């Protein structure tokens, strides 16, 4: 009798774990679909739910940052980008988005540091590097002596 109870308990625990894993995945996938349909409020909610199930889901944070960029909520955008970079410092898209933010702030030293890092990690967005370098030249402090 005890063996049957243990077996049933293991079965229910297994089902619960499988369901939570599937729910996490489905929230992200559904959020991505809504994002591509430009339904940002719905996708934001789904990405936030995905993060509840998996707080280390860097892609949900990245999509949230993009949504906040669209909404012009700079504070939340930067917070989510920083979270992505904390989870994966090699994420080139997050690095690029952070460079854009720092360029707008005219933070020359931070952009220069990010460009060096971006050069090492870029795979897909390497074509954006000349744009950043050109913007960096415009920011470069002038030595007026």
PLM regions and their residue ranges:
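Register position in tetratricopeptide repeats
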Residues: 36-37, 70-71, 104, 138-142
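Canonical positions in the second alpha-helix
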Residues: 49-50, 83-84, 117-118
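Canonical tetratricopeptide repeat
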Residues: 63, 97, 131-135
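Terminal, low-structured helical/coil segments at or just beyond the last alpha-helical repeat
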Residues: 112-145
């Amino acid at each position: 009798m005890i063996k049957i109870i243990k077996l049933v308990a293991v079965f229910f625990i297994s089902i619960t774990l499988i369901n939570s894993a599937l729910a996490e995945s489905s929230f992200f996938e559904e959020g991505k679909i809504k994002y591509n349909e430009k339904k940002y409020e719905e996708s934001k909610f789904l990405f936030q739910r995905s993060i509840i199930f998996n707080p280390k889901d860097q892609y949900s944070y990245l999509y949230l940052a993009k949504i906040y960029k669209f909404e012009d909520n700079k504070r939340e955008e930067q917070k989510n980008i920083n979270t992505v970079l904390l989870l994966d410092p090699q994420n080139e898209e997050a690095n690029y988005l952070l460079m854009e933010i720092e360029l707008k702030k005219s933070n020359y030293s931070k952009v220069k540091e990010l460009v060096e890092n971006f050069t090492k990690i870029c795979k897909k967005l390497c074509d954006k590097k000349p744009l950043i370098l050109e913007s960096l030249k415009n920011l470069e402090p002038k030595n007026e002596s």
